[in-house]
């Protein structure tokens, strides 16, 4: 009886196989996973998938019949993608054997772990927005127990309000608090260069979300593709991406445990066909006096240098500022100034300087920026 010999990498082709060893076990089942090229010669990103499992089986058998493999080995494509490697994930029999004309192949696309690919957040980091938090509780309940809701699930939710008011932060907090996956997409990225690109991207987006459920799909800058037809000159030809997105929002596929949250600054400018797909609209407001003080105090504690100033004096002066404005445009420049001047604290003068930089000589905060 012949002994089976295994090699970690297989490169031989069918034409080289003259005889078969009848004593070798025949493989009934082989699961493959795309592994990539052994040498990367360009920046092109190749993604391998199959639309028809039957065709893939015919193709695979024709290439690899007679190959002897076990779990962990590699098979190399010799036709469409020369030298592209497929890793053998599992076989039956488990100890391995020879690929025959009866071997069944399955192409398994590796699932990407999305849970760690976003910055974690907590509700305690969100100052204010109490009404928004209340409305988001139903999303939390659904992500924690999708089967409880069935067809009554909160599937599509629209966050709207001025920039920097915590829409993305709220979505990240929802994902963190419920241990859900989180996929962030900028709407302009969904516009493809060629016909069919957009619909393919959106289809793959929701396939990833479904595989990673529970999952939040967060579509930022929705108005970039969802403007009303009244603004055709601004929106351009986005019919393909809009139609593909509407198909997903309509729930043609069940996608249990997947919630779509879209964000916009201008809900009134959205196409009614898109806006009507969102069963819930949640408003995010600019912080009031008390909330602005809490935001300043929260970020001041996180700064690498202590703030030696009475932050209450800046509450009225920052009226109309969002939480992001307070951090990025007010506190951060003040901190940088203190560091550049080799001081070990942020002074009132630093804060006044940063404020003057934002407002110039105007007395009123730039509320018009958020309309």
UniProtKB/Swiss-Prot annotation:
GO cellular component: proteasome regulatory particle, base subcomplex
Residues that bind ATP: 161-168
Any single GO BP term: proteasome-mediated ubiquitin-dependent protein catabolic process
PROSITE patterns for the chain: AAA (PS00674)
UniProtKB keywords: ATP-binding, Nucleotide-binding, Proteasome
Gene Ontology terms for molecular function: ATP binding; ATP hydrolysis activity; proteasome-activating activity
Chain's role: The 26S proteasome is involved in the ATP-dependent degradation of ubiquitinated proteins. The regulatory (or ATPase) complex confers ATP dependency and substrate specificity to the 26S complex.
Family: Belongs to the AAA ATPase family.
Name the record gives this protein: Putative 26S proteasome regulatory subunit homolog MJ1494
Organism annotation: Methanocaldococcus jannaschii (strain ATCC 43067 / DSM 2661 / JAL-1 / JCM 10045 / NBRC 100440) (Methanococcus jannaschii)
């Amino acid at each position: 009886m012949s002994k089976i010999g295994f090699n970690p990498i297989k490169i031989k082709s069918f034409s080289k196989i003259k005889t078969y060893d009848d004593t070798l076990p025949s493989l009934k089942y082989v699961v493959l996973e795309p592994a990539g090229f052994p040498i990367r010669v360009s920046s092109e990103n190749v993604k391998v998938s199959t639309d028809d499992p039957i065709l893939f089986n015919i193709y695979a058998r024709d290439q690899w019949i007679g190959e002897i493999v076990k779990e962990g080995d590699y098979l190399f494509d010799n036709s469409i993608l020369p030298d592209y490697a497929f890793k053998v994930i599992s076989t039956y029999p488990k100890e391995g054997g020879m690929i025959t004309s009866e071997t069944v192949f399955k192409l398994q696309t590796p699932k990407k772990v999305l849970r760690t690919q976003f910055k974690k957040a907590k509700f305690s980091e969100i100052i204010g927005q109490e009404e928004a938090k209340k409305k988001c509780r139903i999303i939390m309940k659904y992500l924690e127990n999708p089967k409880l809701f069935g067809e009554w699930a909160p599937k599509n939710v629209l966050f709207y309000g001025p920039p920097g008011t915590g829409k993305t932060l709220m979505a990240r907090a929802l994902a963190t608090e419920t241990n859900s996956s989180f996929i962030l997409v900028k709407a302009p990225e969904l516009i493809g260069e060629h016909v069919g690109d957009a619909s393919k991207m959106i289809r793959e987006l929701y396939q990833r979300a479904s595989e990673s459920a529970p999952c939040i799909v967060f579509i930022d800058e929705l108005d970039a593709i969802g403007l009303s037809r009244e603004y055709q000159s601004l929106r351009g030809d986005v019919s393909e991406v809009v139609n593909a997105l509407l198909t997903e929002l309509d729930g043609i596929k069940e996608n249990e445990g997947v919630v779509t949250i879209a964000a916009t600054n201008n809900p009134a400018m959205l196409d009614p066909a898109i806006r009507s797909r969102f069963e819930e609209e949640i408003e995010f407001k600019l912080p009031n006096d008390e909330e602005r003080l809490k935001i300043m105090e929260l970020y001041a504690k996180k700064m690498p240098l202590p703030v030696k100033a009475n932050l209450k004096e800046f509450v009225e002066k920052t009226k109309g500022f969002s939480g992001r404005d307070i951090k990025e445009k007010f506190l951060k420049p003040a901190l940088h100034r203190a560091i550049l001047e080799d001081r070990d604290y942020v002074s009132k003068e630093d804060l006044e300087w940063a404020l003057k930089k934002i407002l110039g000589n105007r007395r009123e905060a730039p509320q018009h920026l958020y309309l």
